[in-house]
Amino acid sequence: MRVAQMLMVTSSALMLSGCMQQPNTTKGSSQGEGPIKIELNQLLPQESQGTAAKEGKGMVFEVGYGKNGVGCIGSTFEEGVTPLGTFKVNAIMSKDRFEMDESLIQQSGKTKNYLSENLFNNMNSIDFKGDGETGEYGSGYISLTPVPSTPQPFNFNEYDGTYRWYSFAIHGTNDETRIGKRVTGGCINMKNKQLNKLIKNINLGDEVIVTSNQPCNR
């Protein structure tokens, strides 16, 4: 961890050009090899990276983060700000996998089957920037909720007539030149190929720790 912050990420979030979500309780990493660790470099964003255990070996991956900087532990999610702290995985979505905490399924007002068949595709079909581009979440979406939980602005709702959900998350991208930059709506983005590997090796309740080499700015 680095000096200014081992900040255990708190907040479930990311919206529009970024992401978002909702809170839950804590539980140790089911990987049995420690948490996923993400360190944001505010001086050199291109050196921001994450580490995770994969089949007994270390996996290292590049990440991008919020265009408006880094939020303090325990803060409420703001557009464009990536929160620091400790989080747990409360939803995993991709073409081949759908898992979500039961409390979120109940909150959605939909059945698990409906969410499994529609939610990620709906979320990924939205043109957030109005430029005709979709697929901003890339190949998958790992939702994170802060530990301990704090109030967050994440809801299931409609955006331009499309049923969706938003939260703080790790997700893929439709433009890999955005990785290693401060460009997201608050979420952490990574290359799709690496995200696919990560999704195969995580479970609900796994721990994610987000830190920074500089103090939070919000």
Give the ranges of each region predicted by the language model.
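Bacterial N-terminal signal peptides that target proteins for export
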Residues: 1-7
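Repetitive helical segments and hydrophobic/amphipathic motifs
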Residues: 11-14
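C-terminal motif of bacterial Sec signal peptides marking the signal peptidase cleavage site
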Residues: 17-18
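Exported/periplasmic cell-wall-interacting domains
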Residues: 80, 100-218
